[in-house]
Amino acid sequence: MDYYRKYAAIFLVTLSVFLHVLHSAPDVQDCPECTLQENPFFSQPGAPILQCMGCCFSRAYPTPLRSKKTMLVQKNVTSESTCCVAKSYNRVTVMGGFKVENHTACHCSTCYYHKS
């Protein structure tokens, strides 16, 4: 009987440690809003290269029946979202002739990457 109590105690201690670590970890889904942040790879001292980073909104909802009937490939869920993109930028040359966009303003807009 003591044999089972020992393993039960070890199990409970392990479970409580796991739950403590789980609740003390930061929330992974927390994402900062869309802002300019320095790109450490391309930036040089005195000449920072900025890029837009952060989160905007996204949502999913059931596809309305009226819309579903017009689809070639019907899907049950429709989603829409916006991405953090540059509102304005300057083209600059860095590190041996590479041209990059140095963002000057950001906003949430259409996700062009996901468009087909």
Swiss-Prot record:
Keywords recorded for this protein, A-Z: Disulfide bond, Glycoprotein, Hormone, Secreted, Signal
Impact reported for N76D: Increases from 1 to 3 the number of FSH binding a single FSHR receptor
Glycosylation sites: N76, N102
Gene behind this protein: CGA
UniProt entry tagged with the keyword Secreted: yes
Function description: Shared alpha chain of the active heterodimeric glycoprotein hormones thyrotropin/thyroid stimulating hormone/TSH, lutropin/luteinizing hormone/LH, follitropin/follicle stimulating hormone/FSH and choriogonadotropin/CG. These hormones bind specific receptors on target cells that in turn activate downstream signaling pathways.
Family indicated by similarity: Belongs to the glycoprotein hormones subunit alpha family.
Pfam families named among the record's database cross-references: Hormone_6
Cellular component aspect of the GO annotation: extracellular region; extracellular space; follicle-stimulating hormone complex; Golgi lumen; pituitary gonadotropin complex
UniProt-listed Gene3D superfamilies: Cystine-knot cytokines (2.10.90.10)
Signal peptide coordinates: 1-24
Oligomeric form and interacting partners: Heterodimer. The active hormones thyrotropin, lutropin, follitropin and choriogonadotropin are heterodimers composed of CGA, a common alpha chain described here and a unique beta chain which confers their biological specificity to the hormones: TSHB for thyrotropin, LHB for lutropin, FSHB for follitropin and choriogonadotropin subunit beta/CGB for choriogonadotropin.
Name by which UniProt lists this protein: Glycoprotein hormones alpha chain
Compartment annotation: Secreted
